[in-house]
A protein has these predicted regions:
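Transmembrane alpha-helices and adjacent helix-loop boundaries
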Residues: 1-336
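The feature captures the beta-strand-to-loop junction immediately N-terminal to the Walker
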Residues: 384-386
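Conserved ABC ATPase "signature" region
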Residues: 459-491, 539-542
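Catalytic Walker B motif of ABC-type/P-loop ATPase nucleotide-binding domains
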Residues: 520-524
Length: 600
């Protein structure tokens, strides 16, 4: 509600601006709106998705040059002549070309990671810039002039005041669609890209698909901004679509807050106004022409990254009275009688998983050496061993995070070696992690509902236009039910990063249960828990076992393990040294020497 109130106030102020401000300032607001649209795409791509791009300006150029060419050229090529040209055809074809380009470029560059990804965006950004500069049909360095204004039902938007409303209406729609997307099943998958990709894949999220969604969406925003720019200016040349402008867009995102929708508007506004002012003032101070504003912006970004890495929007929020401050995401959650379909679990005693001579080598280090184990439905199996024995490595191979160097992993009768973890999750395996993998800035409820990702069906467009509300409510209620089941029902809207470590481990269990798996892998679930919490966890696992779920756990608390599990497998130096009932393991001489410190 508070976000909607801020939106209403901003919309009112923006709507009145052309009536109250001189033409020059309205023109400046038009540039702010167009820049903010590009930066909004960077909020999705860089701030939320964690993918840095220096090439957004080139995507703006695709939209601008497409509409300019179609609007100005009198004799269009045969394959385009049937369209008749014009601004609206330019918008349509510009979006098609942009989406095709984004799919092509994204398919090549989004597989890169680390510093290679931004270097890749620089490469294709420069390539597109020189394409615009050297193609004679596009005017070369001289550009394209006499671009006609946009017409709506015969009404020409031939002044800055008239263009103002179209620019800001499109920006407003883009902001609403972005907000809707981020507060959805697809949006949570996107938000997991930054720091949670292994977890997301293990929950069934196709992270490459999510990256492509973000990249294409941000490219579409940039292309529309280019379309607006061309018809607002009536003239374009390659200069605004080069690497320098790509860097400027990133700076705007950082300035306002790269992870905030409102930060896109704030960053674009402050940068655009400051640049204009500095370009007028600094030459008078220093004498002569020069890009002095670049020095100021460089100093600003250094100070900002030290004092407010979240950008100026977060600082502005802190200045508001407490009652008006936005308190994170509060998802709409209403009781419902509808529930998610639950796949039938295999019958008790059915063999769920087998590991056959599984070996994992990292160079010359053998982490797992011909490991064998199996687990059946309705059974709790413990995998124990000293630190460094290779237990978590084994977990990663069973769940698809790693691929065995040799040997086979059989899950429900299917060999799963080399299958991505998201595909194994579809078969009915869910897991937690030795080192907790949560999204700390998201609420507990949002973190847990990621586990139900595979149980939802609605996609990007349904999310943007809020056609997914019924399914979304069912998913959220499933997450709420699992949180109540594990004892975290009172923390639904608490930021996950604010929970104690033990509670975060319980959160991971709730998230895994949201997938309704037939096999649950728990990596040190009792670490950090107090006695009563361990007792509650044991009761939960026993109940899950009685329902037919197979549970494989790694744990160092021997009292917890020996009083809970049906069988135990013991590892040392990557090998299995013992397997049997808890009583037998407790009295096994090899285990006592290797793991429990020798015979008493």
């Amino acid at each position: 509600m508070k976000s909607n109130a801020i939106l209403a106030v901003v919309v009112l102020l923006v709507a009145l601006s052309p009536l109250l401000l001189p033409t020059y300032q309205v023109t400046l607001l038009n540039y702010i709106g167009m820049n903010a649209l590009v930066v909004l795409g960077l909020v999705l791509l860089t701030g939320v998705g964690g993918m840095t791009s220096f090439g957004q300006a080139a995507l703006v150029g695709i939209g601008a040059y497409t509409t300019a060419y179609l609007s100005v050229t009198e004799q269009l090529p045969t394959f385009l002549a049937w369209t008749g040209g014009g601004p609206w055809v330019g918008l349509f074809l510009g979006l098609i070309i942009t989406i095709f380009s984004a799919l092509l470029v994204g398919g090549l560059t989004l597989k890169l990671s680390g510093h290679y990804l931004p270097l890749g965006t620089i490469a294709w950004g420069i390539s597109l810039y020189y394409f615009f500069s050297t193609i004679p049909t596009l005017g070369g360095h001289s550009g394209i002039a006499n671009i006609p204004s946009i017409e709506i039902a015969g009404y020409a938007l031939d002044t800055n005041n008239k263009m103002f409303y179209l620019i800001w209406l499109i920006l407003l729609i883009a902001m609403i669609l972005t907000r809707n997307l981020l507060n959805s099943r697809e949006g949570r998958a996107i938000r997991a890209l930054k720091g949670g990709q292994i977890m997301a894949e293990s929950m069934g999220v196709n992270t490459f698909r999510s990256k492509m969604i973000v990249f294409v969406t941000s490219s579409v925003f940039a292309s529309i901004a280019g379309w607006l720019y061309a018809h607002n200016q009536s003239f374009i040349n390659p200069t605004p679509f080069g690497l320098q402008m790509g860097i400027d867009y990133l700076f705007m995102a950082l300035l306002g807050g790269v992870g905030s929708i409102w930060g896109a508007v704030v960053g674009a506004g402050i940068f655009t106004m400051m640049r204009q002012w500095l370009q007028d003032v600094l030459p008078m101070i220093f004498g002569g022409e020069g890009n002095y504003e670049t020095i100021v912006f460089g100093l600003m970004i250094v100070v900002l990254m030290q004092k407010s890495p979240a950008g100026l929007w977060s600082l502005l929020l802190k200045l508001l009275p407490t009652r008006y401050q936005l308190k994170g995401s509060h998802l709409s959650l209403t009781p419902t009688s509808h529930t998610l379909a639950k796949p039938t679990l295999p019958a008790h005693g059915t063999e769920i998983l087998q590991a056959l001579d599984v070996t994992k080598a990292f160079g010359g280090l053998i982490a797992n050496n011909q490991m064998n184990l199996n687990i059946r439905a309705g059974e709790i199996l413990a995998l124990i061993g000293p630190n460094g024995a290779g237990k978590s490595t084994m977990f990663n191979q069973l769940s698809g995070v790693d691929t065995p160097t040799s040997g086979d992993v059989i899950f429900l009768g299917q060999r799963i070696n080399g299958i991505p973890s998201r595909e194994i999750a579809k078969l009915g395996l869910s897991r937690t992690f030795q080192h907790v993998k949560i999204l700390p800035e998201m609420t507990v409820l949002e973190n847990v509902v990621i586990g139900a990702h595979l149980r939802g069906q609605r996609g990007v467009f349904a999310s943007m236009f809020r056609l997914d509300r019924e399914e979304e409510n069912i998913l959220l209620n499933e997450a709420k039910q699992q949180l109540e089941r594990v004892g975290l029902g009172e923390y639904l809207y608490t930021e996950a990063g604010a929970l104690a470590l033990g509670q975060q481990r319980i959160l991971e269990i709730a998230r895994a249960l949201c997938a309704h798996p037939c096999l649950l892998l728990l990596d040190e679930p009792a670490a950090g828990l107090r006695l009563k919490e361990k007792q509650a966890l044991a009761e939960l696992l026993i109940k899950l076992k009685s329902e037919g779920m197979a549970i494989l756990l790694v744990e160092h608390d021997m009292d917890f393990v020996m009083n809970l599990v049906d069988r135990v497998v013991v590892m040392e130096f990557g090998q299995k040294i013992a397997e049997g009932l808890p009583y037998d393991i407790q009295n096994d001489q090899a285990v006592l020497e290797a793991y429990l410190g020798g015979a008493a």
